[in-house]
């Protein structure tokens, strides 16, 4: 089982869009059992995959979220059936993801993640790694994809500690492109602090129009910069204004009738699987 974190320190680069659609394509087109872990306190991946009313119902029925991994203190749990009741922290072995569709599973995010004290010295940043080790030993999944917050944080560190690889979505604009070097410095610092062997799976240009100068400039920079040379995926995620609207309706790229967009996500997914050694 391989674990990949999708990371970038800038919002608006289609990080979540890329992560959930690559996961869906791996599950739908390649028959892999994929677990998405939503580690972003804004839980955009969860909102793009689960309708709001279904999410509320899931919580009311006692469904588990990312908070259950990191919160080791008793807390009040609200249920439409039982009302408010004290809830003891779960053992990591007890935490079960929800089923999104055949082969695609989700450990949802939650705004409640914001209330947790993740200051240094508590060791909570290692809890995700311990959970993923349990998941790995279960044999239930072929791949775990972690959607991370767009800021350097303990959450990002937790994701990197738990991962074998990281993938960087980059929007072809000057600030995003130059920001990848800052991101690399942050990742290197985490690698050194925790003695990690995590590797870069690659860079995917997103929200791309190959006719635009900014796209050509971004491509040229990534293909010539010492560290990033050879790491750019051959295919880019195309610019489509309707993607955000469709995600608001929990529609994934493979659900659309946009053949070029579907081909792009299929090619990106295939290249990722080749890099991971999981190609068909």
What is each of the regions a protein language model found here?
Residues 1-280:
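P-loop NTP-binding core
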């Amino acid at each position: 089982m391989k674990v990949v974190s999708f990371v970038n320190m800038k919002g608006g680069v289609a990080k979540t869009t890329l992560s959930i659609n690559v996961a869906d394509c791996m599950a739908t087109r390649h028959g892999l059992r994929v677990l998405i872990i939503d580690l972003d306190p804004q839980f955009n991946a969860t909102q793009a995959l689960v309708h709001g009313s279904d999410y509320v119902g899931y919580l009311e029925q006692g469904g588990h979220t990312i908070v259950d991994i990191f919160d080791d203190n008793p807390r009040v749990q609200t249920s439409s059936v039982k009302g408010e009741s004290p809830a003891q922290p779960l053992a990591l072995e007890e935490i079960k993801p929800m089923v999104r569709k055949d082969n695609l599973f989700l450990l949802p995010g939650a705004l409640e993640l914001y209330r947790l004290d993740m200051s240094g010295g508590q060791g909570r940043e290692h809890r995700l790694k311990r959970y993923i080790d349990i998941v790995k030993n279960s044999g239930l999944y072929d791949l775990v994809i972690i959607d991370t917050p767009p800021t350097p944080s303990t959450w990002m560190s937790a994701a990197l500690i738990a991962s074998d690889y990281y993938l960087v979505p980059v929007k072809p604009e000057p600030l995003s492109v130059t920001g990848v070097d800052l991101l690399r410095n942050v990742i290197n610092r985490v690698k050194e602090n925790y003695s990690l062997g995590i590797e870069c799976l690659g860079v995917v240009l997103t929200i791309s129009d190959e006719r635009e100068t900014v796209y050509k400039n971004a491509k040229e920079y990534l293909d010539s910069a010492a560290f990033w040379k050879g790491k750019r995926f051959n295919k880019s995620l195309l610019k489509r204004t309707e993607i955000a609207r469709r995600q608001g309706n929990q529609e994934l790229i493979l659900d659309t009738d946009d053949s070029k967009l579907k081909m792009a996500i299929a090619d990106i997914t295939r290249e990722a699987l080749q890099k991971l050694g999981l190609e068909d």
